[in-house]
């Protein structure tokens, strides 16, 4: 996760831009609609955007120094920082950028899934185990796992069945995102649009470019959050909101330094 946070590229989108309308042959030739076409060269969303181009926001503001020549501000999330040279090779740049965006999306969903059930439980909503790393383990109990604490919804007793469902359902969605499906072909798997954008949020190019920046910024924060949730679970055995409540109640004794100096694995 930490590695993907530093990655800045996508194998399928590097060096490409959105073409808003398909050609007539795409519409009438084979009866299928292409979700989003790409051209050969990416074009900045707006000359006045603070997030793109040579005058974009940098990682240390006016103290950032000169950015590497290969970080031109063409892609969202490029703050001109690559101390380790991870993006120097164009193919690696493209691959890492795609990995980062996908991990960002998973991390945002994961962070919400870790916090929201615990938030509901702390406000009186009863639906079984709310702590994220404890909820899944209930499937190994004798009674199995009831989704939302209601056996009439989904009652799971087999981890293999859950795994198979995940593979089939998520595999189908990912396959559609990458290779297209009955609702249309996908040319840009990283930003497929079409059925993946039912609200039409990407219809306006400038708004779409800004949304890409918001996505990558929030996704990076979410990846760090998930890493923090993992560490908290191992060290304290509690959920993130319970840890936060403990810290606010007694910040002197409940903080990262106090746990780091007293942590003994297995206890």
From Swiss-Prot:
Gene Ontology CC, one term: chloroplast thylakoid membrane
Annotated positions binding chlorophyll a 1: 81, 87, 100, 220
Residue(s) carrying N2-acetylarginine: 36
Single GO MF descriptor: chlorophyll binding
Disulfide topology: none
InterPro entries, per the entry: Chloro_AB-bd_pln, Chloroa_b-bind
Family listed: Belongs to the light-harvesting chlorophyll a/b-binding (LHC) protein family.
Protein name listed in UniProt: Chlorophyll a-b binding protein 3C, chloroplastic
């Amino acid at each position: 996760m930490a590695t993907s946070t530093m990655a800045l590229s996508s194998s399928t989108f590097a060096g490409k831009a959105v073409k808003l309308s398909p050609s007539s042959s795409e519409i009438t030739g084979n009866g299928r609609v292409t979700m989003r076409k790409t051209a050969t060269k990416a074009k900045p969303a707006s000359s006045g955007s603070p997030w793109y181009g040579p005058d974009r926001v940098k990682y240390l503001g006016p103290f950032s120094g000169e950015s590497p020549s290969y970080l031109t501000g063409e892609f969202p999330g490029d703050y001109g920082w690559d101390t380790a040279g991870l993006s120097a090779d164009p193919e690696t740049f493209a691959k890492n950028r795609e990995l980062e965006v996908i991990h960002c999306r998973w991390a945002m969903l994961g962070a919400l899934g870790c916090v929201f059930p615990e938030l509901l439980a702390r406000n009186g909503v009863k639906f079984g185990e709310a702590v994220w790393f404890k909820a899944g383990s209930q499937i190994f109990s004798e009674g199995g796992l009831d989704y939302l604490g209601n056996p009439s919804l989904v009652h799971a007793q087999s981890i293999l069945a859950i795994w198979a469902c995940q593979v089939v359902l998520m595999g189908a969605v990912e396959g559609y995102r990458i290779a297209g499906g009955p609702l249309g072909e996908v040319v840009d798997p990283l930003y497929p649009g079409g059925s993946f954008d039912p609200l039409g949020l990407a219809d306006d190019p400038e708004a779409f470019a800004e949304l890409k920046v918001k996505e990558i910024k929030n996704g990076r924060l979410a990846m760090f959050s998930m890493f923090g949730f993992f560490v908290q679970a191992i060290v304290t055995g509690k959920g993130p909101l319970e840890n936060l409540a403990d810290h606010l109640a007694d910040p002197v004794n409940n903080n990262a330094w106090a746990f780091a100096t007293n942590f003994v694995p297995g206890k």
